[in-house]
Amino acid sequence: MASSSSSSHRRLILAAAVLLSVLAAASASAGTSCVPGWAIPHNPLPSCRWYVTSRTCGIGPRLPWPELKRRCCRELADIPAYCRCTALSILMDGAIPPGPDAQLEGRLEDLPGCPREVQRGFAATLVTEAECNLATISGVAECPWILGGGTMPSK
């Protein structure tokens, strides 16, 4: 009877360990998904929105560029390196996060007299040394797929 109890106890511990491993893996992968609401906040980079439109089109709040840049860079730095270019893509083109009531979010608005391609070109450089000096997963100094060049790497 003791060996039967011991065997049941071992099976229970093994099952619990497997369950914990599965939960840990699911939790880790959820934290690394570059989608709004997970590794990227919903409607990401509001300060970068202002910084991009201010620098490219002269539209935005009456804050000096260095202050807008500081805020933008802080928001971008808070996003994991492997999601920064994705966050900038969402800034330009938007994304529909997972969920039953999900709607397009994060997209920089079309502004009269402010060409979208000019904004896109500047947004692609926000991770560069001249702007925020931040690392990305691509290993290049900017996010070229925002401009339509290359494909976005996955983690």
From Swiss-Prot:
Subunit structure: Monomer.
Protein name per its UniProtKB record: Trypsin/factor XIIA inhibitor
Cell compartments where the protein resides: Secreted
Signal sequence region: 1-28
SUPFAM superfamilies named in the record: Bifunctional inhibitor/lipid-transfer protein/seed storage 2S albumin
Disulphide bond pairs: 34-83, 48-72, 57-114, 73-132, 85-143
Keywords: Disulfide bond, Protease inhibitor, Secreted, Serine protease inhibitor, Signal
Active site per the UniProt annotation: 62
Pfam families membership: Tryp_alpha_amyl (PF00234)
Recorded family membership: Belongs to the protease inhibitor I6 (cereal trypsin/alpha-amylase inhibitor) family.
Other observations noted: The sequence heterogeneity suggests that 2 genes exist for this inhibitor. The genes may be alleles, or multiple loci could exist.
Chain residues in the propeptide: 139-155
Role according to the record: Potent inhibitor of mammalian trypsin and a specific inhibitor of factor XIIa (activated hageman factor).
Domain of life: Eukaryota
